[in-house]
Amino acid sequence: MASQGTKRSYEQMETGGERQDATEIRASVGRMIGGIGRFYIQMCTELKLSDYEGRLIQNSITIERMVLSAFDERRNKYLEEHPSAGKDPKKTGGPIYRRIDGKWMRELILYDKEEIRRVWRQANNGEDATAGLTHIMIWHSNLNDATYQRTRALVRTGMDPRMCSLMQGSTLPRRSGAAGAAVKGVGTIVMELIRMIKRGINDRNFWRGENGRRTRIAYERMCNILKGKFQTAAQRAMMDQVRESRNPGNAEIEDLIFLARSALILRGSVAHKSCLPACVYGLAVASGHDFEREGYSLVGIEPFKLLQNSQVFSLIRPNENPAHKSQLVWMACHSAAFEDLRVSGFIRGKRVVPRGKLSTRGVQIASNENVEAMDSSTLELRSRYWAIRTRSGGNTNQQKASAGQISVQPTFSVQRNLPFERATVMAAFVGNNEGRTSDMRTEIIRMMESAKPEDLSFQGRGVFELSDEKATNPIVPSFDMNNEGSYFFGDNAEEYDN
């Protein structure tokens, strides 16, 4: 865990490894990616998918969801103990789309979970390869982050919907391990903690007995993860208070919401990694790419290079704009839902528009939609430049942002000033400043007030030409600072519903 003084790189978390050198990390990440690719190829063979059908992102997502379901131990156990009508706990499945006589058709498939586990293990040298499963979860989480807004969830826990830039990873399953914790935003963890505290307030036995002891350990562990994301001593000290509380209640909820707000200016470190759909890895493996030998990094040039030369298709609803669908998936691939649009647009080499202006719904197709009326089109996932993904909040400073989203959480390590509406955020800090955390609160507010809009974050960091694999010549972009920077501005996206 970050706070225990052992900072592992998130490639190491990703591969469950101990301290390794760079080459070993690149090889083990490559091994993980290659395993996903081999699994995908085998599933396409079993399902008799044509090359074109195998490149359809909707088919990729169905296959990914099947393997996640096959390995979801707790849910599988639950399903076996609580049988529900018409649901076979030993089977998993989903929609597969096939091209028949010039039309797309949906076929619902069912598979034995045991069979899918066999295919997955076989593709991963006989191992369970949990790292690969987590990688797939993070890709789904990034896709959700780009597609949906979490207004309802924020309001339910007493947070402000404008804090959406803190909600990265809010749909990641609990079982996503250290790699999952690394990509969760401050707001996501605050929300999990508040839910826990609220249960404790409503249920006297929540913290008691043997179960309560386990709950308490989980609570403290989550507090430590959140503490490890904060970069200032005062924020960390407040987290110690929350963690050590004998009987967490409303005071702790207040403290957590205060900390979440403070993270809009004093940003937490949240890891970003480019996680691509399984079909992209499958295509590369099928064309003879040896990921383990070549090595791979989730935060380097490799994902950009993969996307430069892989063709992925998507089903498009009759009134959707294929270019907008491409933007959505591009953002998901690079974990850039909360990045400044000016930065994303510069790297992509195309204008990136806010969520509210996109004429596209999510990638997945509901079972009641008519597939025959849909066409498929190529997703444009290429980029003009590449940049290193960051795991820090890029703190120094802030600047004017928009009505919908009042801060960003940077994805790319690229010099810019971070858009941010100081007046809006500071307005939330009037009032409650007494109690046991008052000195820390005062200190945090002071730091927020002294943050200067002109300051540059990621000083001297730039983007790179795609031919510059060793990242030797940074190109530092200049941005029009008055331009709209946030994605969820004026938002009308659908809510995320499980």
From Swiss-Prot:
Domain of life assignment: Viruses
Primary residence: virion
Region Disordered: start-end pairs: 1-22
Any Gene Ontology CC annotation: viral nucleocapsid
Residue stretches of biased makeup (Basic and acidic residues): 8-22
Keywords assigned: Capsid protein, Helical capsid protein, Host nucleus, Host-virus interaction, Ribonucleoprotein, RNA-binding, Viral nucleoprotein, Viral penetration into host nucleus, Virion, Virus entry into host cell
Subcellular location: Virion; Host nucleus
GO BP term, example: symbiont entry into host cell
Any one GO molecular-function label of the UniProt entry: structural molecule activity
Motif Bipartite nuclear localization signal: chain residues: 198-216
PTM description: Late in virus-infected cells, may be cleaved from a 56-kDa protein to a 53-kDa protein by a cellular caspase. This cleavage might be a marker for the onset of apoptosis in infected cells or have a specific function in virus host interaction.
Motif (Unconventional nuclear localization signal): 1-18
Keyword Ribonucleoprotein: yes
The protein's role, per its UniProt record: Encapsidates the negative strand viral RNA, protecting it from nucleases. The encapsidated genomic RNA is termed the ribonucleoprotein (RNP) and serves as template for transcription and replication. The RNP needs to be localized in the host nucleus to start an infectious cycle, but is too large to diffuse through the nuclear pore complex. NP comprises at least 2 nuclear localization signals that are responsible for the active RNP import into the nucleus through cellular importin alpha/beta pathway.
Family statement drawn from the similarity comment of this UniProt entry: Belongs to the influenza viruses nucleoprotein family.
Subunit structure: Homomultimerizes to form the nucleocapsid. May bind host exportin-1/XPO1. Binds to viral genomic RNA. Protein-RNA contacts are mediated by a combination of electrostatic interactions between positively charged residues and the phosphate backbone and planar interactions between aromatic side chains and bases.
Protein name as annotated: Nucleoprotein
